[in-house]
Amino acid sequence: MSKNSVIIVAAGKGKRMNSSISKQFLQIKNKPILYYTLNKFSTHESIDEIVLVTLEDKIEVCSEIIDKYSINKVSKIVPGGKERQDSVYNGLKAVSKDCEVVLIHDAARPFVTSDIIENGIRYANQYGAAACGIIPKDTIKIKNEKGFAIDTPNREDLFIAQTPQCFNYNIILDCHEKLKKHNKKVTDDTMVLEDYGKSVYLYEGSYSNIKITTPEDLILGEQILEKLT
């Protein structure tokens, strides 16, 4: 029977947080951010397996969090790579061989909703690849190399990508292997498919589905958690 697997990418060092502690291990309401992220997927009925990718020297810390909070469905904890795309590739190689749909999600994005997860799986099955996100609230400017505004794109045509990004497993694995062979750099997994001519369906995420990367995000995260609970 085919599985829906999720790769949680927790290999970042969190330089923008100005903290010696990696952002995924910082706490909101006395629990690490990683707990909230893992718990959201482990309690979702459509998720069969979690593969956690982290820094090699943080594997033990992650194991302790999983044990302390009795997180289910984590099949493996694997070390990350030099870049995010290397970490994702390590995760892809570690998922179960009967995986059909794989979701790739930032560990520092703890407020993903059940609907976002479910819709991602549905659209990945339908289109082969899907990513959630939001239309920007602010006006976006394009500037030239001298710092002057040269264009103002229509906000309705713009999309701020979030995670999870959801894929047919064989498609994303094949594209990552090509990426590695050609030594290309990308900043998210939809770019991996775009580089090889594959289409990605974009669907509605949530303005609360923030990635916690700065001290200000921690404050906002506490406010979001209070509203959710």
Swiss-Prot record:
HAMAP family attached to this UniProt entry: IspD (MF_00108)
Disulphide bridges, residue numbers: none
Reaction catalyzed: 2-C-methyl-D-erythritol 4-phosphate + CTP + H(+) = 4-CDP-2-C-methyl-D-erythritol + diphosphate
Residues of the site described as Transition state stabilizer: 16, 23
Family annotation (PROSITE patterns): ISPD
EC number(s) reported in the record: 2.7.7.60
SUPFAM superfamilies reported in the protein's UniProt record: Nucleotide-diphospho-sugar transferases
Name the UniProt record assigns to this protein: 2-C-methyl-D-erythritol 4-phosphate cytidylyltransferase
Domain of life: Bacteria
Top EC group: transferase
Annotated pathway: Isoprenoid biosynthesis; isopentenyl diphosphate biosynthesis via DXP pathway; isopentenyl diphosphate from 1-deoxy-D-xylulose 5-phosphate: step 2/6
Known role: Catalyzes the formation of 4-diphosphocytidyl-2-C-methyl-D-erythritol from CTP and 2-C-methyl-D-erythritol 4-phosphate (MEP).
Keyword rRNA-binding: no
Gene coding for it: ispD
Stored CDD domains: CDP-ME_synthetase
Pfam families the UniProt entry points to: IspD
Any one GO MF annotation of this record: 2-C-methyl-D-erythritol 4-phosphate cytidylyltransferase activity
GO BP annotations, alphabetical order: isopentenyl diphosphate biosynthetic process, methylerythritol 4-phosphate pathway
Site entry (Positions MEP for the nucleophilic attack), positions: 155, 211
